[in-house]
Amino acid sequence: MFLGTHTPKLDEKGRFFLPAKFRDELDDGLVITRGQDRCLAIYPTETFVEMTREIAKGSVSVKKVRDYQRMLAAGASDTAPDKQGRVMIPPMLRRYAALNKEIVVVGAITRVEVWDATEWEKYSEAQEEAFADMNEEVFAEQ
């Protein structure tokens, strides 16, 4: 499980130090892909494979299914942290999330999200007020 908020820096090669508490779950491999809300999502490889099996069950005759499968797969990059615990984010994904040197790495239970620091600040401030209401809605749906 991924929890917490961290603020590593993105270096000139597009690498950042993965927080130590996330490394055990991601050392065997990870997939970086487009996330929702213009962030990046990082999944353990096994979790990503399970997720894509479910997505692959959708009918390719449905345009939205095709589009989603295509965009998810085209934006995905499989990798592993290097010996120092750094992860390299491909240029295309850095552009998608508008990442600069200042980033925020967020544990989001089943995945790790990587945000541009300014965008994370805007997003989290906007969501803070609605958090209590979200709790009622999320648990009412289960």
UniProtKB/Swiss-Prot annotation:
Location comes to:
Cytoplasm, Nucleoid
Predominant subcellular localization, coarse grouping:
cytoplasm
Q: Which InterPro entries match?
A: MraZ (IPR003444), MraZ_C (IPR035644), MraZ_dom (IPR020603), MraZ_N (IPR035642), MraZ_sf (IPR038619), SpoVT-AbrB_dom (IPR007159), SpoVT-AbrB_sf (IPR037914)
Q: Which domain of life is it from?
A: Bacteria
Do the record's keywords include Cytoplasm? yes
Q: Name one Pfam family in it.
A: MraZ
Q: Does this UniProt record's set of keywords contain Repeat?
A: yes
Keywords noted in UniProt: Cytoplasm, DNA-binding, Repeat, Transcription, Transcription regulation
Any one Gene Ontology molecular-function term assigned to this protein's record: transcription cis-regulatory region binding
Residue ranges of domain SpoVT-AbrB in the record:
5-47, 76-119
Gene Ontology biological-process entries? negative regulation of DNA-templated transcription initiation
Subunit description:
Forms oligomers.
Matching entries from PANTHER family are given as: TRANSCRIPTIONAL REGULATOR MRAZ
Family statement drawn from the similarity comment of this UniProt entry: Belongs to the MraZ family.
Q: What is this protein called?
A: Transcriptional regulator MraZ
The protein's organism comes out as Cutibacterium acnes (strain DSM 16379 / KPA171202) (Propionibacterium acnes)
